[in-house]
Amino acid sequence: MASSLMVPRAAGGTLRVVYEDIQASSGGGGVPVLLVHGFASSRRTNWVVPGWYRSFAAAGRRVIAFDHRGHGESEASHAAADYDEGLLAADCAAVLDACDVREADVFGYSMGAMVTIRLLLDHPSRVRRAVLGGLGANYLTPSPLKDSVPEALLAADPSTITDPGARGFRVFADAQKQDRVALAACWRRPRTTAGAAALATIRAPVLVICGETDAITGSPEPLAKLIPGAEARIVPRRDHMTAVGDRVTKDAVLAFLDA
């Protein structure tokens, strides 16, 4: 059953964030895993539908997952400042606090992987091991979709969207029945991409994993090389949307977190 907590807005006030804490059915004492979903997605779309809840349950893991502010069942804001990645990382820590968990393994996908990097930097004691899924070389460079995605999300007529990448985000957001104004604000959030010096301070073991044909993220190796001891994996013949639930991804993630 889902629960909720209140998290701070940038300029005062709070937003309601919905989360789930699913105890391992086997009663196993393994480290809990916190799942951090991607942009325009939700805990259900990113983790339940691809079978991650089942996979972690079979591994005896306690699963903690939540909907980012502005996504899924969580409360939305239309102010970009409310989606600052420092706030999103603090939400992760707040969810762990609500579940009385001091330290967890963390698996973030796409935007969730960006937030996981910020969690590793701002709250390092909360992360035992981390998986950065659907994130790679393109994290290190400005997104070519910086302006086109929010424009596509706010377009009155989707048929007028000419950028194929931006159109894909609009189609996905519509399929999820998300608040597109909130998503546009989230995309325009204040971003502080961690540079080489910051990434070099990460001490937790990290796995960077991407689909072979993922044009959104690029190759995992350039990002992994900047994080001390990080591993890089490529999921053959998979793109940004299909890599997340692939068997190769699941085997690699479960093996890494159990190491």
How should each PLM-predicted stretch be described?
Residues 215-220:
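Conserved alpha/beta-hydrolase "acid-adjacent" motif
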